[in-house]
Amino acid sequence: MSTTTTSRPASGRAERAPGRTSGAGALARSLRTHPELWALGAIVAGGIALRFSTLGLQSFWADEAVTVGRVLRPSLWSTLGQVHSSEATPPLYYILAWLWTRVFGHSEVGIRSLSAVFGTATIPVVWWAGRTLVSRAAGIAAAALVAASPAMVWYSQEARAYVLLILLSAVGFGFFAVAVRRREGRMVTWWAVASVLALLTHYFAIFTIVPEALALFVLLPELRRRVVASSAAILAVCGALVPLAVHQANQGHDVWISNISFGTRLDYLVKQFVFGYHGSSSSVLTVVVLAPLLATAVLATRGSWRSPGWRLAAAIGVLTIGVPIAAKVFGQDFFFPRNVIASWIPLAVAGGGAVAVPRLGWAAVAALCAAFVTMAIAIDVTPKLQRSDWRDAAKALGPGVRPRAVLGADTGANPLTYYLRGAHKVSRGRVTVSEIDTLAFTAAPVRHARVIPRGFRFAGRGSSPGFIFERYVSDRPRTLSVGALSEVRLEPAHSPTILQEPR
């Protein structure tokens, strides 16, 4: 005779309705049954460590100094006015940065932490896009590549709009992937929303949006009306941005791009995408990174070529770079590595396709991630691979004890104005000073035929990492023209004179 026992709930606890669980319990079971989420969590944790641990290590460079020293003002309205006149991008990043700095401040760590958040958020977004378009394994591999990439870490530690462009382009690419896979019209709409936000961050989001829109039009014939309507909405936003873009272009912020040869810019593209902004510091490190990179590329092509999603990711990545190159033919020269940095996302998804090759694929991706982390650490410990250290240069110059003119090295006017308290730029006219400090990059050619103004005598020479400077003083303040001061420069490159009054 069998005996049936009935289990009872623990004292003081009510039984849960069948099928209903707590949020924490659901998450715990999901983690147990989905090791993919554990892998993603570990990858995100590694990405956080790489991005947040060294936020304050490097000085602001020239463009970051513009962000914190000129664009971000006490009022949001004044900030938008500075974006209009001082920047070459739409205002979305600066609105978010203005809000962020109300809480976290304008220091290197304070404002860059916003970029680090954006950079970290990009990692799971790329996982989502990769697993949707190619495979779950490819999504994990792509997320790992983005987490470890020196280029992605670099922009995640920069107080500029590029990392928000990367994040929003990744979100748009994710919705694009879902739209292609599920063939759902609402996903096309969400793709358009993400694309508009990317455009409001940076005009060059269009380089990714155009090939994605064409792909949606071709691949989703049953949704073409939705694709056309969504593309028209994006085009309307582009039209609304035209007056701002034209005004900013007339300020000449990007004219320097065309002064760099196309071949040199292609070289920069490879160096910056693979090794970080300043390239590799040694031939050994170059080989350590390039060998697994080439292996990953070959294995990805071999293992995933038959996958339509993989081919689509590779095509979007290549076309994001190709669109501005094609525009150059028509006289619109915007091609520069950071202007096509959003291509890193679909290319990472394509690279993640290497794991389709059993064992060798995962080995290649793991080796490439290890090489990327090695390169990122090398940047942290090698000053010449970092941003120019204007912060230490300002410390070496010391506080101004008398009215002085500081003749900065090329690109140094904005960061020196920021780090030298009470300083401002002077482009013309005359100044009254009793000290002249002239600064140059250590590696720059030094002018030997210089004219020291009458009444000034040599008072010493100093240095800081990456810079040298000379100081000339006078027994009394003397009035000099900006033109006369330019004859004292150590470097032949022109940079505005900085006037600093003692406090």
Regions picked out by a protein language model, each given a short descriptive name:
Residues 3, 31, 35-503:
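Membrane-proximal helix-loop-helix interfaces that form the catalytic/acceptor-binding platform
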Residues 1-33, 368, 501-503:
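Short, intrinsically disordered terminal tails adjacent to the first/last structured region
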